[in-house]
């Protein structure tokens, strides 16, 4: 029995990591599809430099609601993301950084390495224990949308 407990703990940890990764990937797919659709409809405000401005309150609510519905995640899950600057490497409206927390664990996706690159590689980060999202860093660019933009108790036309 003493040999079995450590191996079961490792198995459980791997299962938890896979569950968080599946939730985060579901969120990423839903968020990217929602942003692509909004961009195609001309609903995303673009500034004079060709970058995206944060959406107004009503648009942010609508986008966040659609992402929550498409991802089928619990509304208690927290997420936030930024969009990449459009250039030859990335098409317009590509998610650059996505942070996700399900209330117990946290994971980050980066389209390119962050700073320092060794601690913030491109792709999915390791799953970490956390009860909430960290404060958005200005080094990660302009925060475009977050789960708290969805406010079901507030009227949105």
Feature locations, PLM:
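Alpha-helix exit/C-cap motif
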Residues: 29-51
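Short, surface-exposed interaction loops/tails
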Residues: 85-157
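Short, flexible N-terminal segments of the mature chain
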Residues: 43, 53-64, 115-118, 126
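Long, low-complexity intrinsically disordered regulatory regions
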Residues: 77-79, 83-84
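Hydrophobic beta-strand residues in large extracellular and virion-surface proteins
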Residues: 27, 31, 81, 95-98
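Acidic, glycine-rich loop-and-strand cores that form catalytic or ligand-binding grooves
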Residues: 48-76
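Amphipathic alpha-helical segments typified by the pilin-like N-terminal helix
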Residues: 1-26
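A generic structural signal for secondary-structure junctions
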Residues: 13, 32, 39, 121-125
């Amino acid at each position: 029995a003493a040999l079995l407990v450590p191996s079961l703990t490792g198995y459980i940890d791997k299962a938890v990591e896979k569950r968080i990764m599946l939730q985060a990937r579901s969120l990423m797919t839903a968020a990217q599809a929602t942003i692509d659709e909004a961009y195609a409809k001309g609903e995303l405000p673009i500034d004079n430099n060709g970058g995206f401005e944060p959406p107004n309150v009503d648009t942010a609510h609508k986008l966040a609601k659609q992402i929550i519905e498409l991802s089928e995640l619990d509304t208690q899950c927290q997420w936030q993301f930024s969009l990449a600057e459009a250039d030859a490497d990335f098409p317009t409206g590509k998610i650059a950084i996505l942070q996700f927390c399900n209330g117990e664990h946290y994971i980050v996706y980066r389209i390119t390495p962050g700073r320092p690159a060794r601690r913030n590689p491109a792709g999915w980060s390791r799953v970490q224990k956390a009860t909430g999202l960290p404060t958005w860093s200005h080094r990660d660019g302009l925060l475009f949308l977050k789960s708290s933009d969805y406010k079901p108790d507030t009227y949105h036309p």
